[in-house]
Amino acid sequence: MIPKPIIIDISEWQDPQQINYDQLTAKIDGVIVRVQYGSNYIDKHYKTHIKEFQKRNVPVAVYAWVRGSSYADMKQEAQDFYQRAQQFDPTFWWLDVEEQSMKDMRGGCEKYRKKLKDLGAEKVGVYVANHLYAQFNLATEKFDGVWLPTYGKNTGQYQGARPTTTNSYDIHQYTSKGKLSGYNGDLDLNQIVRRDLFYFFRQDHQISDKENNKEVEGIEMKTITTTATKVKLRSSPKVGNNIIVALGKGTSIKINDIVFGDGFVWGVQPRNDGKKGYIDIGKSVDWVK
């Protein structure tokens, strides 16, 4: 079984030349891209991966393997991570903690987390190896999310194996041998255990930079926030099976026009693929007499 929503995490080990992004993006709901391995090693393909996924309206989070050997080094790694990724406006920032690079990993990772926050990262989470969780004793309660791996038999599908070190986590990486259309190699697959997709992968990144905050089409670009638990973004201004995605409560999206159709008023969301999304913002009778 491959639980939905489907989240993958990738790095330079997944060569862009070997990926059919059109096929792969049709199968996934979000991606977490590696940016660096410590400060001194930059992932060869992180920019390409991010651009290709965002071009196809897949929300992108980022991660960095943590290798800081001192408090100062941890803060420098955070600085480098932020400078390398902030231009892409990732939905979430993850620390990947899989080795003991300094004695006080708890204190060091807290310095890293706080530096990212101070720089402007909205949400910062931590990935920590299951067998190192207790040893490192990270201050996970200060992070915005906890991501743990446990593979079981590692068959490429989820077969019930769960992290054993704690029950308090949000995302579970359940295999390193996943298979999806668009890439013939192995993929890390993840499932969301707590919260929902939109907490980790907001959708407002879908607005292209050239349109952001400019007056285009009918109205000046506006940001609206959903107040219901499931608000449907549709591919046309009418009620039916034309759903692009169901937005969670508190999701922000940008609109640049309003249209009338099917008895409703629709906010129009421009999208990077040149198409439009439509969100119901009220009944027509409430807007006109």
Where are these regions (language model features)?
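SH3/SH3-like beta-barrel superfamily modules
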Residues: V245-D286
